Design a protein with these regions (language model features):
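Pre-Walker A (Motif I) flank of P-loop NTPase domains
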Residues: 2-6
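P-loop (Walker A) phosphate-binding loop of NTP-binding proteins
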Residues: 12
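Conserved lysine of the Walker
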Residues: 17
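A glycine- and Lys/Arg-enriched "phosphate-lid" helix/loop adjacent to the NTP-binding pocket
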Residues: 104-185
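Conserved small/polar residues in nucleotide/adenosyl-binding loops
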Residues: 208-213
Length: 213
């Protein structure tokens, strides 16, 4: 049997990824389409322990000072464990997976740390090989990128609880404006590089509603 399909919704922090996944789930349920949904990092699993430590600042408060290679391994292990324990058989038997973030988020947040073009390309090639060849994780069938400029996403995140402790205190990515700007700028390049489907969340300075997206 052919392997299944993996559809990823990614985007800048606060862009509405979780909301759009929920709307897809409701539509699939209504139409009787079988699927599995997953969110990364998988905070409900022990496999995300190092990710939580990283985002809480236990390895340092400045994400720029933490190697993108090292940080990426934390997320990759979480994805591997979640895939092996949660949906490998389902996917290999033709199942449909809806993912809120994926390897794509590492591309955005970690590659954005690297200023040199050649070094950034080297990192992206390494990450692809690491997750899709070494770990043999599924390559996305399609990535939908929610493009929301930082000035809008930060306003939406102001009063939002973080997903680790569910408190208002932001993680080291969310509270670092420069990191978010670098990640956003990198994402705009990756959309073209990997042919992601870009969904613009703002038009003429007006924020689209979740239904419009």
């Amino acid at each position: 049997m052919k392997p299944g399909k993996l559809f990823v919704i990614d985007g800048t922090d606060g862009s509405g990824k979780q909301t759009q996944i929920q709307k897809l789930k409701e539509r699939f349920d209504k139409e009787g389409i079988d699927y599995r949904a997953v969110s990364f990092p998988n905070y409900d699993s022990d496999s995300s322990a190092l990710v939580k430590m990283y985002l809480k600042g236990e390895f340092g408060d400045d994400p720029q000072k933490i190697s993108p290679y090292i940080a990426s391994t934390f997320y990759a292990v979480d994805r591997y464990a979640t895939f092996k324990k949660g949906y490998e058989d389902y996917y290999n038997n033709g199942g449909i997976i809806l993912a809120d973030r994926y390897t794509t988020a590492n591309m955005v947040h970690q590659a954005g740390k690297i200023k040199d073009d050649k070094e950034r390309e080297k990192f992206l090639n390494w990450l692809w090989d690491f997750e899709f060849n070494l770990y043999e994780l599924p390559i996305p069938t399609q990535v939908f990128f929610l493009n929301m400029p930082i000035q809008y996403s930060q306003k939406l995140m102001q009063d939002r609880a973080n997903k680790i402790t569910h408190e208002e205190k932001k993680d080291i990515h969310e509270k670092n404006k420069q990191h978010l700007e670098d990640a956003y700028n990198e994402a705009c390049k990756l959309v073209k590089k990997y042919n992601w489907c870009e969904i613009k969340c703002v038009n003429n300075c007006l924020l689209y509603t979740s239904d419009a997206a």
